[in-house]
Amino acid sequence: MIAAERSRFDTPPDARVAAVAARQHGRIRVDQLKACGLDHAAIRRRVAKGHLHRAHTGVYAVGHPGATLHARIMAAVLAGGQGAVASHWASATLHGFIRWDERRIDVTVRSGGGRSRAGIRFHRSRSLEARDITRVHGIPATTAARALLEIAPQLTQTRLKRAVRRAQAERSAHVRQIADVLRRANGHTATGRLAAIVATGCAPTYSGHEDLVLDLLLDAGFAHPAVNQRLALAGATYYPDLRWPLSG
């Protein structure tokens, strides 16, 4: 037996459980518990002693039941099984361009995942590709660009525009990435609305006030300005809200 294997099996099961849970916001799946060396009887004993706390069917909190939002989203993803990812509003919240509002956590799977349950809404998507998946705060999630398409039907055009621009400001999504998602959207109901926003150009705004001024200028026929772009001037660096570079 090689050293790495010997070290793994010499480690007590509870230490292995703690190590796995530490990477998953304190949450762990039953199959992971078994891989750590616990059978069903051992799991039941730890539940009875308060070492494990049921979060969802087949998912446990390790040590204590307290849950941050990240832990709740991680638990929902684990409940979806292998390949499940946070999506829609949950993904947008992880990426930082939408505020969480205590709705059910959206999880997308390619297949399986079971029925939606208390606190979780499962979605199935055959079109979800590897390039649409990332990790945010250690949680498997759809990319920001994909999340924008997913939440678009739930938002007014004004709120969708704000989300797109905020995602750019957070450097979560670039217009090129959003355009790529749109090309592969296969007739998604919100494709046209999202495409109309992306077509106006790069606009990484940080506030609703910046949005308002930018929209007023564009509606008045002004050329699209550079928005919050770096400007080096006289040895200093500035980030003007809106700037029209000199031409000619």
Q: What are the residue ranges of the model-derived segments?
A:
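Active-site metal-binding core of divalent-cation-utilizing nuclease and nuclease-like domains
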Residues: 113-117, 130, 222-247
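A short, surface-exposed helix-loop junction/capping segment
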Residues: 190-201
